[in-house]
């Protein structure tokens, strides 16, 4: 029998979704569920309406209350004499979809209800969570026990999600023959199963699927002349510029195609009851070039591919508007260019939008992405209706690979709420064998219901409860990953990236390996339990990292006095955990987009068991002049008046010819250098660029990036041999004439890796010029002993409240102004140059800041100035704005150009005009020899 007392009163001081309720006046009796193993209440279930759903909710409540109290709760249709009543499914008028309502009416009556049977079920789970139950994973729940369970007499709670559709493409939520899975998806309040059942609510279909040419007007039926000559209609599909037909896009002007499409949609509405219909393309963004579609495109001032999509959507919507007035039709905006002007392309009242935001850094909040304007904001002008999102939350290269994005869900969902999103479908780690996959699933489900929930508290609670004896190590692992992600601001975590060495150092890998060994040793002493199963699962990504980076670990481990086990032992442990039936192996590579289990193991076995090393005899720097840069078709070698060569990239047209999508094409306006044997190894990478735009300013007029070639790619996964690991956007301005040097950070290059510059495509750009790419040896750049070229924390002074700290992992010193210190007068961090540092040099500052406003171009400011004297005030020599984003807190190396440094000159880092900051940090200042870069005048204003 339970022997712990669990009295719950705290909820009466909580806030509901719509406000707060009165405090207990002290003389009312609480509602008592059970005491000393005896039920004090019976559950009365509603029998009208969706009776099966209400009874399911009542049975769930009875089951969990029984587990908590040891009592047996009756589920009946009428109140029972001598027992209080818990009414499940009372008649209720909900204000919002999926709303729940819980209210203690008296000491004898508690009502749990909501929006239909589903809202009632959510009310049951909400109450159980209030009592401390946690539904973490399909095979792990936390259920507290008590001798007496009661609820305050004035307890009232009303809550509702901001999203109507909440779906994850995850094995623990999909229908796969395991009845536990569907039950679990309800506890996480996911709505995917509502497409298949109406026991709880009306069938609810999320209208953002890729269905055109696959499900509707299927190419298998209408574009396969060999198999189906009788139904062959190539004219129904988009005509390409070369005369071929696109199997992924429909012709938006063919009347016969529309008749077929109308018939197929009508059947689904009538026979399946669908109320939301997707008209999303099949992973495509091509345009049709037939005469009819050319007229549609000509009506669009942007001349992009969006007008044809809108024309198709609106025609379908108009056709069904009177016949099926309650049905909504959506297109899936997947890189399509928004037609202009918005007034000409407004959507029909029964038409809507959904977005697939693929091209972005998925380890930073979505609001940080500079393409949000063209990908989302511009399109929102076409409709006043809520929109839907196809989201991404993992690496498609390998689900087991560490992927540092667990802390961005709340920020993302708050942004989605702000722009009016009411539905989400996310491709997260499909298998529980992913990188702490179930933690990601849990955070996703909690935060897409309530974006304002404390994600840090949710994370810590989950880790401590689920991983139990190894919770400390798991939290340390998350912190290592967060720190590694923030080492360099411009690291880019795309969803196809597979190169962990672009952000995790060899030392990081050894630290994580040590955590995993501690976890393994501790678990040996633990008896079999759900916690142990999940703790072993948590080791999977750590073991994958050790196997895939074993050569790097061999180089770092001796310096850290760590002895590594044989690689084969680690791979075998990984295989055993991966193939354990409890870890859902069959659901790993669900779409062929990720490594399958065996390919992961082969990949690890392919890694050499010899320590990686830097090439011997690396020079201090390698400068690649414009004359040495190769690249795409639209580039031209030109010269300045003084003869300095540069490459001019022609950014017009922005869209890729024949496709209409706005994306950067390496075969067009691109230049760069592909690493050969001479450029292998680790370098700080710089590019000197200038960009001119029609607008006064443009945040992403050009990009400096890195495609990292992976040397151990297997034949099983050659689709993505290059990882895009840096994507640094470069601002431009009208009539820009000055060169600016940009640093993407420090990266290890393999042969065939490519450093590149491309034109931006978000808004029109006049020109992008590239003068050079420079590779600087870290031994030169980070030489703290060279007082002539390196100014560290010892040369910095801070305004009131500033503190000098030591980095917890990399052990460098830096100065910080926290949020409180930034409220003082004139907050700043100032480096003063010495006599020894007097020279002509290219000046760089390594800084970071915590912006609160997305895409803040002027979050901080660096100013180089002469010292003030009795006779002269300080004179600004150069200055530069420092940009920032929320949760984009990485260190960045910022150029102030080639300058003449004199003793006593100062470099000041201060807040800019971009809004409130959470912190402001200065780590070091670097003075590089001018001969590394061509000419003078790089950077500062």
Where are these regions (language model features)?
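Structured mid-domain segments that build the active-site/substrate or prosthetic-cofactor binding neighborhood
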Residues: 249, 253-257, 267, 371-472, ...
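Feature activates predominantly on carbohydrate-active enzymes
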Residues: 52, 56-60, 64, 93-280, ...
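Aromatic-lined carbohydrate-recognition surfaces of secreted/lumenal glycan-active proteins
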Residues: 314-340, 387-394, 426
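Extracellular carbohydrate-recognition regions
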Residues: 604-651, 774-809, 933-941
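Catalytic domains of carbohydrate-active enzymes that cleave complex glycans
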Residues: 447-686, 693-709, 729-735, 740, ...
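Short beta-strand-plus-loop segments that form exposed binding edges in beta-rich domains
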Residues: 758-765, 909-917
């Amino acid at each position: 029998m339970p022997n712990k007392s669990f009295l719950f009163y705290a909820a009466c001081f909580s806030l509901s979704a719509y406000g707060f309720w009165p405090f207990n006046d002290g003389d009312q009796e609480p509602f008592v569920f059970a005491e000393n193993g005896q039920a004090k209440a019976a559950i009365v279930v509603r029998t009208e309406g969706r009776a099966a759903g209400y009874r399911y909710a009542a049975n769930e409540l009875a089951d969990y209350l029984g587990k908590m109290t040891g009592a047996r709760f009756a589920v009946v249709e009428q109140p029972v004499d001598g027992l209080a009543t818990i009414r499940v499914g009372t008649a209720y008028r909900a204000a919002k979809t999926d709303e729940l309502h819980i209210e203690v009416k008296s000491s004898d009556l508690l009502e749990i209800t909501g929006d239909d049977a589903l809202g009632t079920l959510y009310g049951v789970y909400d109450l159980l969570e209030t009592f401390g139950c946690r539904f973490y994973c399909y095979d792990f729940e936390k259920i507290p026990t008590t001798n007496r369970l009661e609820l305050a007499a004035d307890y009232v709670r009303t809550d509702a999600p901001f999203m109507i559709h909440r779906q994850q493409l995850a094995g623990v939520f999909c229908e796969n023959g395991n009845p536990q899975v569907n039950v679990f998806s309800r506890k996480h309040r996911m709505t995917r199963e509502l497409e298949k059942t109406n026991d709880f609510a009306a069938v609810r279909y999320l209208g953002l699927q890729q269905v055109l040419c696959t499900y509707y007007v299927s190419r298998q039926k209408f574009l396969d002349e060999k198999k189906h000559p009788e139904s062959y209609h190539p004219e129904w599909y988009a005509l390409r510029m070369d005369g071929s037909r696109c199997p992924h896009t429909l012709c938006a002007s063919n009347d016969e195609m529309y008749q077929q499409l109308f018939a197929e949609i009508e059947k689904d509405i009538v026979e399946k009851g669908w109320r939301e219909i997707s008209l999303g393309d099949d992973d495509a963004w091509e345009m049709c070039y037939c005469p009819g579609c050319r007229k549609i495109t000509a009506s669009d001032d942007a001349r992009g591919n969006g007008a044809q999509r809108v024309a198709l959507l609106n025609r379908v919507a108009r056709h069904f508007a009177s016949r099926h007035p309650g049905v909504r039709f959506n297109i899936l905006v997947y890189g399509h260019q928004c037609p202009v002007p918005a007034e000409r392309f407004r959507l029909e009242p029964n038409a809507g939008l959904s977005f697939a935001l693929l091209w972005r850094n998925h380890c930073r909040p979505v609001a940080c992405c500079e393409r949000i304007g063209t990908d989302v904001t511009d399109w929102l002008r076409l409709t006043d209706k809520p929109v839907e999102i196809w989201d991404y939350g993992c690496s498609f290269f390998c689900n087991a690979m560490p992927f540092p994005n667990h802390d961005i869900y709340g920020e993302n969902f708050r942004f989605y709420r702000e722009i009016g999103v009411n539905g989400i479908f996310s491709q997260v780690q499909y298998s529980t064998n992913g990188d702490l996959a179930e933690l990601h699933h849990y955070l996703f489900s909690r935060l897409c219901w309530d974006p304002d929930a404390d994600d840090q508290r949710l994370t810590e609670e989950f880790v401590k409860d689920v991983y139990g004896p190894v919770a400390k190590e798991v939290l340390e692992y998350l912190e290592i990953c967060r720190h590694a992600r923030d080492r360099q601001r411009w690291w880019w975590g795309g969803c196809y990236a597979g190169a962990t060495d672009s952000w995790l150092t060899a030392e990081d890998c050894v630290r994580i390996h040590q955590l995993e060994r501690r976890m393994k040793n501790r678990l040996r002493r633990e008896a079999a339990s759900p916690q142990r199963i999940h703790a072993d699962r948590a080791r999977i990504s750590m073991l994958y990292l050790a196997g895939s980076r074993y050569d790097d670990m061999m180089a770092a481990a001796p310096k850290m006095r760590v002895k590594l086990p044989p690689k084969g032992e680690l791979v075998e442990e990984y295989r055993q955990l991966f193939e354990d039936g409890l870890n859902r192996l069959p659901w790993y590579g669900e779409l062929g987009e990720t490594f399958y289990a065996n390919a992961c193991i082969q990949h690890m076995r392919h890694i050499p068991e010899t320590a990686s090393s830097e090439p011997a005899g690396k020079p201090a720097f390698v400068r690649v002049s414009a004359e040495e840069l190769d690249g795409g078709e639209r580039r031209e070698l030109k010269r300045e008046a003084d003869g300095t060569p540069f490459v001019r990239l022609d950014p017009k047209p922005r869209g890729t010819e024949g496709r209409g999508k706005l994306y950067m094409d390496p075969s067009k306006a691109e230049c760069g250098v592909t690493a050969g044997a001479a450029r292998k190894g680790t370098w700080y990478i710089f590019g000197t660029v200038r960009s001119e735009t029609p607008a006064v300013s443009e945040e992403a007029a050009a990009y400096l990036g890195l495609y990292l070639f992976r040397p151990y790619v297997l034949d099983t996964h050659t689709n993505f041999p290059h990882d895009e690991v840096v994507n640094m956007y470069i601002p431009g301005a009208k009539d820009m004439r000055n060169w600016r040097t940009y640093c993407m950070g420090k990266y290890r290059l393999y042969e065939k890796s490519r450093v590149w510059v491309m034109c931006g495509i978000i808004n029109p750009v006049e020109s992008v010029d590239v003068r050079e790419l420079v590779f600087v040896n870290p031994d030169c750049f980070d030489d703290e002993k060279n007082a002539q070229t390196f100014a560290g924390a010892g040369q910095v002074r801070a305004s009131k409240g500033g503190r000098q700290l030591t980095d917890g992992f990399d052990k460098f010193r830096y100065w910080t102004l926290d949020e409180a210190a930034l409220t003082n007068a004139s907050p700043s961090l100032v480096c003063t140059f010495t006599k020894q540092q007097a020279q002509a040099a290219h000046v760089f500052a390594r800084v970071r800041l915590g912006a609160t406003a997305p895409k803040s171009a002027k979050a901080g400011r660096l100013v180089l100035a002469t010292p003030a004297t009795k006779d002269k005030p300080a004179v600004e020599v150069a200055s530069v704005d420092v940009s920032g984003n929320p949760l984009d807190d990485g260190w960045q190396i910022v150029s102030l150009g080639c300058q003449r440094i004199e003793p006593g000159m100062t470099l000041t880092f201060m807040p800019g005009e971009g809004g409130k900051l959470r912190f402001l940090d200065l780590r070091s200042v670097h003075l590089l020899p001018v001969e590394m870069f061509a000419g003078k005048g790089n950077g500062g204003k």
